[in-house]
């Protein structure tokens, strides 16, 4: 039995070689598997690392976003598929495609407005011209047919876009296609769009293609052109120039239509039948198409602007048309004068306001007999402000915006500046919002001292543009030059305990040229810190560390100095107690005055009763009882 077991337990050389080969193959496969898994994991890690590097948010900016954005970003990062996973061909199970809805405030919608405004403008300019001038229609018939039906295609597409254009309801964009279609069909635009797409040009089959007036219903799409003008005026940086151009365009279109109607009336009455209508086309100089249109345009311009003499009308219909033209011309003239006058006033309003400030300062300096040198410096300072467009009062401009938008604009404008200050690097987002709203732009002239050694520090400054010099007491020797992005005075406004310099300036800083600085006052900082006590303590600790690093703090002063926070709290408590006492005293004084008044009235009544008794009058019983009660 043992022998059998021994024989069975000893494999043959062939079996051993096969097993060794299988074992080696398993080792190779396991090694390749581990290597492949390692390569896949390294590639996944590298892709995530590169993705994180590409989209690493600024930690300073991150503090201005709420937790909702962070949750969204976390969900998006968790939703990234693993390298080994395969997406289903339908894009994911249970995922429903959202319908395409156009946001009316998006750039895509504005670009579509630009595209649809072109065929509308084409129809308004050329349909009437082709209907009145036969040569223009017949000589370029193929071109007009292509343009007409291309415009019709855009009209149809515009109806589809309008049916998918979202609208706001309770502040949210409605994206339900059924509600969008229902909302669109209830508007006047839908009715006009339907009327503008009625295929009236099917009458071409019976009348011929030389009747473009059959397509006049395409003019009902004018609302798209007006909407394009309104949105362009809102988006452009030169609204006054655009308004003037828009007004000129409207005037030219009216003159163009009037010229075409004049030529059509002349054709109806008969060319050359009288002095008012267009001359006889049998003459070669009046037979050309260009001469026909230019002559009609010239007549229309003279009539509507009433600046020239035209041949007087002869027939009744001619008189009626000229009267209507005169009335339209008066309206055009009044509109142009009024609009251009208001636009010019709006364009010159900043200059007029700024010039009024300069004039008032000049009058004051002349009245106070200011030296010519100082007066010249003041005028140059004003010139610098105007030349560099620094005359805008930011608070006045932004006063109509809500606080949230004010904060976002301030963050967008001043965030890069505030990031450069060390003590504000790790502040709370709410405190940073408060601080950026309190930054005030300040401009210094050449040679102006921003601060001098020993002055009490009430502001800190951040250099936006310009150069400042740290000078010696003699005002000549320069130690260092501060440029864009530098800041100073941040420690003095914190009033840190134990500072060797206290809250006084330790250097003389002077402006070399014109310098633009941002100023943050101590009062504004403390007002913002009242709602953030933890941030206040953190700022003070950070300022104390900076002073200790520069060996500018005295530990003995820290130990000996009374805690200013306790003193401030006591002062605040005393102020509140004083307010309460004043209120109580005022109430007691009012009660005392009222009681005195009642007492005087009672004494007066008693005196009158005593006088009556002394004079022999017998008062009634009720009065005597009242007097006894009063006694």
UniProtKB/Swiss-Prot annotation:
Tissue specificity remark: Prominently expressed in retina.
Extracellular side: 134-139, 208-211, 263-288
Spans annotated as Cyclic nucleotide-binding domain: 429-549
Basic and acidic residues compositional bias, start-end: 87-98
InterPro entries: CLZ_dom (IPR032406), CNG_cation_channel (IPR050866), cNMP-bd_CS (IPR018488), cNMP-bd_dom (IPR000595), cNMP-bd_dom_sf (IPR018490), Ion_trans_dom (IPR005821), RmlC-like_jellyroll (IPR014710)
Reactions performed catalytically: Ca(2+)(in) = Ca(2+)(out); Na(+)(in) = Na(+)(out); K(+)(in) = K(+)(out); NH4(+)(in) = NH4(+)(out)
UniProt entry keywords in alphabetical sequence: Calcium, Calcium channel, Calcium transport, Cell membrane, cGMP, cGMP-binding, Coiled coil, Glycoprotein, Ion channel, Ion transport, Ligand-gated ion channel, Membrane, Nucleotide-binding, Sensory transduction, Sodium, Sodium channel, Sodium transport, Transmembrane, Transmembrane helix, Transport, Vision
Membrane topology note: Multi-pass membrane protein
Region (Disordered): 1-21, 71-98
Summary of the function given for this chain in its UniProt record: Pore-forming subunit of the cone cyclic nucleotide-gated channel. Mediates cone photoresponses at bright light converting transient changes in intracellular cGMP levels into electrical signals. In the dark, cGMP levels are high and keep the channel open enabling a steady inward current carried by Na(+) and Ca(2+) ions that leads to membrane depolarization and neurotransmitter release from synaptic terminals.
Known partners and oligomeric status: Forms heterotetrameric channels composed of CNGA3 and CNGB3 subunits with 3:1 stoichiometry.
Family: Belongs to the cyclic nucleotide-gated cation channel (TC 1.A.1.5) family. CNGA3 subfamily.
Name of the protein described by the UniProt record: Cyclic nucleotide-gated channel alpha-3
């Amino acid at each position: 039995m043992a022998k059998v077991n021994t024989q069975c337990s000893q494999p043959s050389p062939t079996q051993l070689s096969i097993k060794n080969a299988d074992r080696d193959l398993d080792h190779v496969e396991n090694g390749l598997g581990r290597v492949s898994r390692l390569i896949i994991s390294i590639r996944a890690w590298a892709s995530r690392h590169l993705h994180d590097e590409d989209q690493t948010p600024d930690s300073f900016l991150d503090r201005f976003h709420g937790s909702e954005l962070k949750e969204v970003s976390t969900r998006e990062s968790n939703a990234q598929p693993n390298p080994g996973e395969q997406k289903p061909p339908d894009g994911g199970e249970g995922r429903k495609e959202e319908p395409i809805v156009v946001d009316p405030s998006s750039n895509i919608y504005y670009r579509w407005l630009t595209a649809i405004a072109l065929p509308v403008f084409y129809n308004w300019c050329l349909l009437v011209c082709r209907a009145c001038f036969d040569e223009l229609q017949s000589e370029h018939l193929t071109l007009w047919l292509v343009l007409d039906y291309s415009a019709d295609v855009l009209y149809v597409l515009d109806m589809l876009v309008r049916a998918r254009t979202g609208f706001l309801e309770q502040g949210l964009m409605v994206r339900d296609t059924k509600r969008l279609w229902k909302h669109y069909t209830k508007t006047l635009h839908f009715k006009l769009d339907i009327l503008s797409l009625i295929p009236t040009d099917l009458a071409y089959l019976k009348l011929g293609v030389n009747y473009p007036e059959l397509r006049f219903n395409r003019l009902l799409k004018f609302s798209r052109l007006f909407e394009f003008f309104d949105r362009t005026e809102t988006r452009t940086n030169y609204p006054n120039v655009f308004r003037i151009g828009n007004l000129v365009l409207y005037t030219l279109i009216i003159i163009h239509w009037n010229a075409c109607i004049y030529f059509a009336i002349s054709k109806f009455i008969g060319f050359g039948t009288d002095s008012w209508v267009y001359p006889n086309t049998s003459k070669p100089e009046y037979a050309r198409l260009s001469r026909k249109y230019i002559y009609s345009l010239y007549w229309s311009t003279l009539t509507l602007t009433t600046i020239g003499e035209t041949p007087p009308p002869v027939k009744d219909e001619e008189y009626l048309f000229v009267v209507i033209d005169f009335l339209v011309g008066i309206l055009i003239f009044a509109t142009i004068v009024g609009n251009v006058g208001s636009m010019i006033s709006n364009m010159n309003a900043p200059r007029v306001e700024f010039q009024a400030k300069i004039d008032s300062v000049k009058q004051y300096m002349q009245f106070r007999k200011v030296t010519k040198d100082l007066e010249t410096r003041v005028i140059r300072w004003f010139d610098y402000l105007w030349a560099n467009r620094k005359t805008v009062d930011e608070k006045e401009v932004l006063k109509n915006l809500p606080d949230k938008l004010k904060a976002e604009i301030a963050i967008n404008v001043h965030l890069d500046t505030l990031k450069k200050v060390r003590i504000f690097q790790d502040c709370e987002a709410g405190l940073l919002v408060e601080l950026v709203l309190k930054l005030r732009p300040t401009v210094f002239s050449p040679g102006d001292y921003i601060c001098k050694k020993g002055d009490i520090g009430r502001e800190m400054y951040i250099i936006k543009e310009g150069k400042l010099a740290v000078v010696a007491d003699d005002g000549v020797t320069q130690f260092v030059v501060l440029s864009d992005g530098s800041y100073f005075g941040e420690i003095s406004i914190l009033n840190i305990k134990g500072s060797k310099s206290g809250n006084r300036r330790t250097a003389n800083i002077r402006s070399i040229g014109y310098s633009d600085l941002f100023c943050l006052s101590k009062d504004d900082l403390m007002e913002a810190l009242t709602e953030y006590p933890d941030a206040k303590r953190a700022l003070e600790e950070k300022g104390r560390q900076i002073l200790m690093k520069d060996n500018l703090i005295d530990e003995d002063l820290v130990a000996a100095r009374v805690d200013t926070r306790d003193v401030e709290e006591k002062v605040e408590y005393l102020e509140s107690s004083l307010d309460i006492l004043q209120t109580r005293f005022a109430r007691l004084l009012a009660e005392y005055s009222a009681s005195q008044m009642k007492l005087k009235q009672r004494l007066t009544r008693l005196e009158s009763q005593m006088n009556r008794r002394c004079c022999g009058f017998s008062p009634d019983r009720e009065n005597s009882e009242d007097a006894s009660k009063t006694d």
